[in-house]
């Protein structure tokens, strides 16, 4: 498989650590950035050669907002970046609204530890993960 460069964004340092450790087990995944807020993420995106952003849905808003506002901004300004939302929110209305933003996948934090690697593998095959 081709190497996939991934950025992780979550406002909880322990979650960032856990995601990174999980992704380090996948030989074709390279973590190129980790961010705890949307401002740091957006300010650094142009400098990073990333294929995929794995982002929490609820992070401190800062200048660029969070959730749907942040995803809309990224889709508008970085259209080639694939987005996987990692969230603990399982509200069907919110998940539907997020999927309507044409993201590449949603992974629930309360899901199986294998869900995130499966989502990335689906992306490698040109598929979405929901």
List PLM regions with ranges.
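Two-component/phosphorelay signaling modules centered on CheY-like receiver
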Residues: 13-33
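C-terminal output helix
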Residues: 93, 111-124
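Short amphipathic alpha-helix used as the core "switch/output" element in two-component signaling
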Residues: 65-79, 96
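Active-site residues of response regulator receiver
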Residues: 56-57, 87
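Acidic, metal-coordinating helix/loop segments flanking the phosphotransfer/catalytic sites
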Residues: 34-52
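As written
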Residues: 98-104
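The short loop immediately C-terminal to the conserved phospho-acceptor aspartate in CheY-like receiver
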Residues: 58-62
């Amino acid at each position: 498989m081709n190497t996939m460069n991934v950025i992780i964004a979550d406002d909880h340092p322990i979650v960032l650590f856990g995601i990174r450790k999980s992704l380090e087990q996948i030989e074709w995944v390279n973590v190129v950035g980790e961010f705890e807020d949307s401002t740091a993420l957006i300010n650094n995106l142009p400098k990073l050669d990333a294929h995929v952003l794995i982002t929490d849905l609820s992070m401190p808003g800062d200048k660029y907002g969070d959730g749907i506002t942040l995803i809309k901004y990224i889709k508008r300004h970085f259209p080639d970046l694939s987005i996987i939302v990692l969230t603990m929110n399982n509200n069907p209305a919110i998940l539907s609204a997020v999927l309507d933003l044409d993201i590449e996948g949603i992974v629930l934090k309360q899901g199986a530890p294998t869900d995130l690697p499966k989502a990335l593998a689906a992306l490698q095959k040109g598929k979405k993960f929901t």
